Each structure stands twice: as C-alpha cells, then as structure tokens.
C-alpha cells in the first residue's frame, strides 16, 4: 500500500494533552514538529488548509496533516478539529 503518515505541528511549551492523546492513538506513523523551535517558524502563519506543495503549508498550533503518497490529503487545524477529525 501507499505510505500514509501524519505530521503533528504543535508548541511543545503549550501542548494540549487531549490532542496529544488522540495523536498518540493513531495507527499510522506520526512525525512531530515543534512550532516553538525557530527552525520551524517558516511553517507558522494563517492556516493554509490542504496545499499541493509542502512549502506553501502554513499552520497554527496545534495542527495535524495527513499525507498519502507524498500529497497532503487532510488538514486539521485547532484542537477541536483535530479531535473530531482523527477520532
């Protein structure tokens, strides 16, 4: 099958435990990106939603994206949307 994975963008200094537990329960691989780290600040901005090019991606904390075959297929922004979208 095609590789499916998630990327969890969040501020490690202000993590929502209810979101973390939903993310931790996912069956597919999850990559975590710390938005508190200046190295990742290029991702932060007005949430872009699903984009074709990862370089156009903008997120706020917390956000989860779902990636399949190198394409973003879902974008969940904010804790409520993540919890509803991933459960």
Q: Predicted regions span which residues?
A:
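Short acidic, S/G/P-rich loop/turn micro-motifs used as interaction or catalytic elements
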Residues: 11-15, 37-40, 72-73, 81
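Local sequence-structure signature of Cys/Sec-based thiol-disulfide redox active-site neighborhoods
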Residues: 1-32
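Small/flexible residues
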Residues: 31-34, 68
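Surface-exposed alpha-helical segments enriched in charged/polar residues
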Residues: 21-24, 55, 84-87
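An anionic, turn-rich surface loop/hairpin at beta-sheet edges
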Residues: 35-56
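Non-catalytic, surface beta->alpha helical segment in thiol-disulfide oxidoreductase systems
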Residues: 58-87
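Short, surface-exposed loop and linker segments with low hydrophobicity and enrichment for Pro/Ser/Thr
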Residues: 1-4, 52-58
